[in-house]
Swiss-Prot record:
Role this protein plays: An essential GTPase which binds GTP, GDP and possibly (p)ppGpp with moderate affinity, with high nucleotide exchange rates and a fairly low GTP hydrolysis rate. Plays a role in control of the cell cycle, stress response, ribosome biogenesis and in those bacteria that undergo differentiation, in morphogenesis control.
Classification lineage: Bacteria, Bacillati, Actinomycetota, Actinomycetes, Micromonosporales
Assembly and binders: Monomer.
UniProt-annotated stretches for the region Disordered: 440-481
Organism of this sequence: Salinispora arenicola (strain CNS-205)
Gene expressing this chain: obg
Protein name, per record: GTPase Obg
Length: 481
């Protein structure tokens, strides 16, 4: 049964926002109680948090579908809907979050680091929140926004100070088992280790972690022998230690050729050229092993490697190797920038939601793209004429109509915003559109507000009784003569 998983694809669905409520307050002796529809609750979000007690992505391998709860709808009497519960997924230290296309969204390193990978939908406003001086009793409310929906790839890259690299059966697992408390599986056949093993080493005043990376073979950088999956775990290592088998029975192999082959794979993988290296010539307790180590040692030292002759079985030479590891780790930590103690919650990149663009589509339609217009479209109930009118007013205030006119759009053209398409008829003609202002076909003559003189004349006509003479605008009185 699989016990270690370092790559999974999660199908994430954040919660949808609850719809706003349309309600009018009803109470005895209050005929005009006003709107009291509450707002919808926000949908739950999906977040990833680093937990030091988690070491594998195994749980997500069996449960890849994740969905947060939706927000509740608003209700009358100004009752807001409850927010959906946020869903927190615990991941190992060193988890990289990517899109299916390979774009890195977050690199989670450090206990408590949190990334909001899918944000819950915003709850719709009720008619009480939409009321203003002009619109005293709205007969509509906003719909809740749908939550984010995406597929995310989680990859685990082990966080260790030192990585042990080498051919299969070079003795890497045996070495980590004697210098730390790690208990990896050890056997006398290749590829016994199929998953990275981590161990903590304490020597002198230094404490560091060591990763036993599964064996590499020529072609690993191109994926041969699961090499890409194994090489991923050495990316974060500050120091690399070549573990070389000096007692191999393969006539075509020798320690120098093994190191050259592994170095070629590390170079092909990329990004590891600046890591300091050590060489551990292992199995010198085996007959002819010590002789071969002494033969190749001068050649390796001439290449700039620090070479140690060791035996994981008898523990010979391990103390010197561990001290050298500690020195290199201390130097790497001193050169690294200081780590902030406060864990910051990483959120998706903010956008300028006030901006929008207008472009002509190949099919002749005009496409409006922008965070606000698209969000307003999602929040509008198109079965409610008043809600559609409110949307038109908001788009006009944002400048969408003006920009469409300047781009060359004509009345009746097809306009596409988000997933909605409609025929465009500007609310009012402006100076950039030829014609009389107010000549919109949707505006009837009866909707024009009468002048003050017309209103005064109409009031006098209503007050005049049949048979009475028309009222004079002049005041009657004595002339004083």
């Amino acid at each position: 049964m699989t016990t270690f998983v370092d790559r999974v694809v999660l199908h994430l669905q954040a919660g949808d926002g609850g719809h706003g409520c349309v309600s009018i307050h009803r109470e005895k002796f209050k005929p005009f109680g006003g709107p009291d529809g509450g707002n919808g609750g926000h949908g739950g979000s999906v977040s990833l948090v680093v937990d030091p007690q988690v070491h594998t992505l195994l749980d997500f391998h069996f449960r890849p579908h994740v969905k947060a709860s939706n927000g509740k709808g608003g209700a009358g009497s100004n009752r807001d809907g409850a927010n959906g519960a946020d869903l927190v997924l615990r991941v190992p230290n060193g988890t990289v979050v990517q899109t299916t296309g390979g774009t890195v969204l977050a690199d989670l390193v450090g206990a408590g680091t949190t990334f909001e990978v899918a944000r819950g939908g915003r709850g719709g406003r009720g008619n009480a929140a939409l009321a203003n001086a002009r619109r005293k009793a709205p007969g509509f409310a906003e719909l809740g926004e749908p939550g984010d929906k995406l597929d995310a790839v989680l990859e685990l890259k082990s966080v260790a100070d030192i990585g042990l690299v080498g051919y299969p059966s070079a003795g890497k697992s045996s070495l980590i088992s004697v210098i730390s408390a790690a208990k990896p599986k050890i056997a006398d056949y290749p590829f016994t280790t199929l998953v990275p093993n981590l161990g903590v080493v304490r020597v002198d005043n230094h404490t560091f972690t060591v990763a036993d990376v599964p064996g590499l073979i020529p072609g690993a950088a191109t994926g041969k022998g699961l090499g890409l999956e194994f090489l991923r775990h050495v990316e974060r290592c500050a120091v690399l230690v070549h573990v070389v088998d000096t007692a191999t029975l393969e006539t075509a192999r020798d320690p120098v050729a093994d190191i050259d082959a592994i170095e070629a794979e590390l170079t092909a993988y990329g990004g590891l050229a600046d890591r300091p290296r050590l060489v551990a010539l292992n199995k010198i307790d085996v007959p002819d092993g010590r002789d071969l180590a002494e033969i190749v040692r001068p050649d390796l030292e001439a290449r700039g490697f620090r070479v140690f002759e060791v035996s994981a079985a008898t523990r010979e030479g391990l103390k010197e190797l561990m001290f050298a590891m500690g020195e290199l780790v201390a130097a790497a930590r001193a050169a690294a920038p200081p780590v902030e103690p406060t864990r910051i919650v990483i959120r998706p990149k903010a956008v300028d939601d006030a901006g929008f663009t207008v472009e002509a589509a190949p099919d002749g339609a005009w496409v409006v793209r922008g965070t606000r217009p698209e969000r307003w479209i999602r929040q509008t109930n198109f079965d409610n004429e008043e809600a559609v009118g409110y949307l038109a007013d908001r788009l006009a205030r944002l400048g969408v109509e003006e920009k469409l006119g300047k781009a060359g759009a004509q009345a009746g053209d097809l306009v596409r915003i988000g997933e909605r398409e409609f025929d465009w008829h500007p609310t009012l003609y402006a100076e950039f559109v030829p014609g009389v202002r107010g000549g919109d076909q949707r505006l009837a003559e009866k909707t024009q507000r009468p002048s003050a003189a017309e209103r005064l004349a109409a009031r006098k006509a209503r007050r005049q009784r049949p048979g009475d003479e028309p009222e004079s605008d002049e005041l009657d009185g004595d002339s004083g003569e």
